[in-house]
Amino acid sequence: MIREALWMVLYSGHILLHKQTIWRKDLMAWRRFWTSYRAYRRLAPPDKLPRLRTLTPCLGEDTAETSIEPIYFYQDAWAFEKIVQAMPPGHVDVGSQHKFVALLSKVVPVTMVDIRPLALPLNTLHFQQGSILDMPYEDDSLASVSSMCVVEHIGLGRYGDPLDWQGTEKAVAELKRILAPGGDLYLSVPMDDINRVYFNAHRAFSEQYFESLLYPFDIVERRYIHGNTFSDERGSGRCIGCYHARKPH
């Protein structure tokens, strides 16, 4: 427990420093907000002035560029294009980001499988509650399956799932089981030079190890997200790997 206690002290210090940085940024954002508010009051006629009770500060959104999270931006666009081009008779997604699944359902018949209930209904999207470790499908039954940035989380307890040190391996095996011969699988995972466990958050995998989990599937395409770049080159260090694999006949 001594090691764990020391880690908590170091981690708390890191969080405190981060919060101090955020606090300084917030202070500057508030200054800009009130400066802007006073300037607006000088511009608007009396009957068009904003009231204090309706002020809605949107701090930190006055950036020079549109803020984009690159992982979901690139991986979802990549998977969406691949699936729409293939135009399967039906597609099953397991645990991916809900915006990706909702948009895809407007083009392709989609069933969304997730361990937690879907809070909002959508007329083009069929929802099936279930676990990626025990999918409600027969062997060799599906033509097209996706699971974007999901399998690396399985077994770490982040989303209320049971702890399992082989969670990723079991999840990939289950996705392989339900795909029909010739079926397409779309996955994305964090990659690194060696396998790592960032406990409670996710795992990262070496390319060699992750592709061994996909065997004997054929790798149709590999793409990599390095920071703000989407590339065909693996390079070294951390990245997100996007995989299109196909089950052999």
Task: Describe the function of each predicted region.
Residues 146, 151, 155:
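A conserved beta-strand element that flanks and buttresses the S-adenosyl-L-methionine
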Residues 105, 180, 215:
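Short conserved AdoMet
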Residues 163-184:
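A short glycine-rich, Lys/Arg-flanked "PGG" loop and its adjoining helix->strand segment in the class I
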Residues 133-145:
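A short acidic, Gly/Pro-enriched loop at the edge of an enzyme's catalytic core
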Residues 157-159, 184-209:
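Conserved class I S-adenosyl-L-methionine
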Residues 1-85, 89-90, 198-216, 220-228, ...:
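N-terminal accessory regions of S-adenosyl-L-methionine
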Residues 85, 90-135:
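Class I SAM-dependent methyltransferase SAM/SAH-binding core
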Residues 110, 185, 220:
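Hydrophobic anchor at the start of a short beta-strand
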